[in-house]
Amino acid sequence: MRARRLTAAASVAALAVLSLGACGRSAPDVAAYVGDTTYSVDRVDAIHDEAQATYAESVKAAAAQQGASPSPEQLKLNVDRQDILNLLVGIDLGKRIAEDKKVPVQDQLSAEQIGKELGVPNTEYAKLAAEWYDLYLGLQAGLPPAELTDDSRGDLYAALVKADVAPAGWSVDEQRQQFAGAAFTRQVSAVSVALQDEVEKLDVTVNPRFPALEIPALLQTQSGLRQFDLPYVDGNGQVTDVSTPEPLPTEPTEPAAS
């Protein structure tokens, strides 16, 4: 994925979501519909533009201290509007899941920490990113792990390759072998399953200008935390086939491996 999102405590009100009346679900100024709530394109643009402007100023200030002039490419924040929508919708759905499944969510990443790390201090993007990752880490730890199919394992592998977390070229058998002992694969798949369930329940619809809805996921590696995006809704508002949840036991059984 790209260097981006993280940070902790924006309320639903701070998301500036709009109440949806009895209208259709294809307005061009709406980025996404989540149940009876809409997220406007203007809102997505405003969050992105604030983060971009703040990042450019941070880069200029750092370069000035060294007597340098940054290039236009260096001034560009590696976060796009798709990333913003992923956060807005992910937080909405994640809160519903945590409440419904009684999953505890703790403050683990602060807006201040993320804002400083990414060069976007005091921005709504930093707040949203931290809030999402607190939710993500809570859901990943608190939901029952899910089993992967070859197709869903391939989707996860493709996301890791795209983020330069895994090398390209693994065969299906190699993917099975490499992921066999990796607990995170079943954990992130559990988050995907829960999000897919909410998408279907709430009739989530995405504006065609956004290619997908993705999970901004974290992975602990030997070189530190890495980030990657795992799609769970395609650009037509359809749930993707990412994983299959394990059935919940009706009688006490041995706990599932995590």
Residue ranges with predicted function:
Residues 148-258:
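A C-terminal, polar beta->alpha supersecondary segment
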Residues 106-107, 146-150:
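Solvent-exposed, non-transmembrane alpha-helical starts
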Residues 26-130:
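N-terminal targeting/tethering segments
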Residues 14-16, 29:
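Exposed boundary/loop context
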Residues 1-14, 81-82:
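N-terminal export and membrane-targeting signals
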Residues 45-80, 123-147, 154-189:
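Well-structured core secondary-structure elements of compact alpha/beta domains
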Residues 18-22:
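C-terminal motif of bacterial Sec signal peptides marking the signal peptidase cleavage site
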